[in-house]
Amino acid sequence: MPALVVSPDLVRGAAGASAAPTPAPAAATPGRTVRDVTSPVEVRPVEPSSPAAQVPMAPARPAAATGQASPAAAAPASAAPAASASPADATARKPGSTEVRALRIRGTRSVELVAEGDAELQRDDILLTADALTYREPTDEALAEGNVRLRQGPDVISGPSASLVVGERTGDFQSPRYEITRTKAGLEPGDPPRQVSGGGHADVLHFEGENQYRLENATWSTCSVDDPDWYIKARDLQLDYDREIGVAKGGTVVFKDVPFFWMPWAEFPLVGQRQSGVLPPTIGSSNKTGLDLTVPYYWNIAPNYDATITPRYMGRRGLQLGGEFRYLGDSYAGEVRAEWLGRDRITGEQRTLGSLQHRQQITSSLYGSLDINGVSDDDYFEDLSSRVSVASRVNLLREGRLVYVGSPWWSASALVQSYQTLNSDPDNPVTTPYRRVPQLLTTASRPDLPAGLTFNWHGEYVQFAHPDEDHPEGNRFTAYPQLSLPMQRAGFYVTPKVGVHYTRYDLDEPVAGLTDARTSITRTVPIFSVDSGVTFERDAQFFGTAFTQTLEPRLYYLNVPYRRQNDIPLFDTSRYDFGFAQIFAENRYTGGDRIGDANQLTAAVTTRLIDPETGSERMRALVGQRYYFEDQRVTAGEALRTSRRTDVLGGFSGRITRYSTVDTLLQYNPEDNETERFNFTFRYQPEFAKALNLGYRYARSLVSPDGTIGLRDVNVSGQWPLGGGWYGVGRLTHSLKDDRLTEAIAGIEYDGGCWVARVAMHRFATDPNDVTKAVFIQLELNDLASIGSSPVNLIKRSVPGYGKINDPAANRVFGIE
């Protein structure tokens, strides 16, 4: 039995009056007696061998200024047996000891102690307070009456009466008000942990061991305990904080005093972790599906396996059954997803979806993956999804990959890849990419060779196949060794580089339309380049603020001789989009079917403003242009370049005020005196959940998926508090070229403190004649559940700077991540 320290707290009033303790019952062995209040007194422990003792009186305390009694807790004495406690060590407390404090204490230590008046019992981090408290040491039982309050760490339970076996954590609490707090992992990797509190009221709370509670006719919520906006009301409520699971029997979810979700039996997460059970429904609507109702069932099979079974009713389409299975092992992870609609009410056809993603660490050096996706028809996503990012998918990947890392400087991989191409618009068919059956790759990079050289290698063998018979097929072998000599000093660098790009093709048949086309083709192209740059710095001051300004000119020379390539099919090659990412590239084409001839010099200059105290970049401006010394001869189907210089590229980005940022990009054609491309974005974001954005896009020669040429649109978006917990959010994108609205989002959010409600409407046009509309309605109960269809991901993609206004649960609904 833990050692017991008895510390009576006596109160001295005005004029020297004293409150004497109630004497303890007589005992066979005389105990210590209470000394006169005028003499010095030491607080002493009662040794475990003493059957009874009279309580010593505490030293007199100063009276309150008003002459009234001023209670204060005396410091407990040491628990060391057979030794007196001095005032110097009175604050020491032995771990596991039990301390009883009160204004009056009477009784026999080894039988029963009765503490009255501001009574306290403390053992380690447990503190039980009440008007009156009885402690029975033989059974370690505490009985408390009147204003009872139990605190253990951050947990607090209060009520009129309680009984508790302290060591076993068993007992009962009558009519309790309780609040239990636990630490939950951060919302994102690297985020600090946060506190999650749940509490409520009950007729009776039963302690059933450490971290185990059972409550009768109880409520539970993450809102304020005394006035919750939402709560779970249950006939029987079990809270298991070891497994972090709550079980409600005969339960109902109540929101604003209105019952809206009945749970005859349900498990729910106490701190947001995954739990098996029927999940709250997802309700939405779109013009493609009509009423859209989903009632998922989540099955937490094991800590590393789970599944979700998702019946979905669509008013215009019918009943769909979906499922997802996720798994995780020491060396593997993945998920399987399937959807089945037996008969679409509109098309009259069966519609299905299947998806598999698997990742496998086979050995310490060998890694494998599978990514297989497929649907039953071309219109599957457009008809059955309300998300623009999904509805606009056209190529579904199907691939298997093996990667071998031989050492820190070389690796190899094998790939088998194909696509399912969705052609939902017969008037604008999408070209199906070539299959790679297989592709073998080797790469290497070895710096710090003798004389400071760096060696790089790229090798490839790939067999191309196509589902359409009118496309040529064949294989390609590539070997590209390179040597460079990086020379870097303070303030400048120069890197000359030389390589030989060798390619061999073996085609099933020659390219149609060429009289001298070959089926066996070799191409050897030497490539030489020099990259160089200088950095200048100076102290500068703009608008009264000190900066470090840099000036960074860069020159890049590239020489690639012409080689005939017009009889090589375009298996995986197209022209890069011109921009700053490509202006210093070695090849103007993607893939390996074209090596662009070049005798050119790229010149660019960048200037930055850097905060000298923090080193952060405040602003950046850059301009660049490429100059050609020879005419272009190699093409990939595009028109030949005739000018001796490219368009001028210019860009500016930075924080122009404390809360405002600007990002611009300009592509200017000096030959035609035309702007080819211009992008402008402005953001004002003074604080969290306050953001306003303005954007403009212009592209003179961009070819749209529908075949139209040119782009010119403006968009505005933002999120802003409206007052009283209300927030507005929205986005408008208007095509100035076609004078039509291409996308619109309008939403409103309300932050209720422990819950958030969202309503949003979305309209987008996948093409001028096909407009999809969707409505999202969501009620999110913090750290418990999200009910309805969530617009959050849509808004995050569409409104830069959007902030989710509540501290969201890590999981969507009742534990699904």
From Swiss-Prot:
Together with LptE, is involved in the assembly of lipopolysaccharide (LPS) at the surface of the outer membrane. The keyword Membrane applies. GO terms for cellular component: cell outer membrane; transporter complex. Residues 1-101 are annotated as: Disordered. InterPro entries: LipoPS_assembly_LptD, LptD, LptD_2, LptD_C. It is found in: Cell outer membrane. Residues 13-90 have a biased composition (Low complexity). Belongs to the LptD family. GO terms for biological process: Gram-negative-bacterium-type cell outer membrane assembly; lipopolysaccharide transport. Residues 1-26 form the signal peptide. It comes from Azoarcus sp. (strain BH72). This is LPS-assembly protein LptD. Component of the lipopolysaccharide transport and assembly complex. Interacts with LptE and LptA.
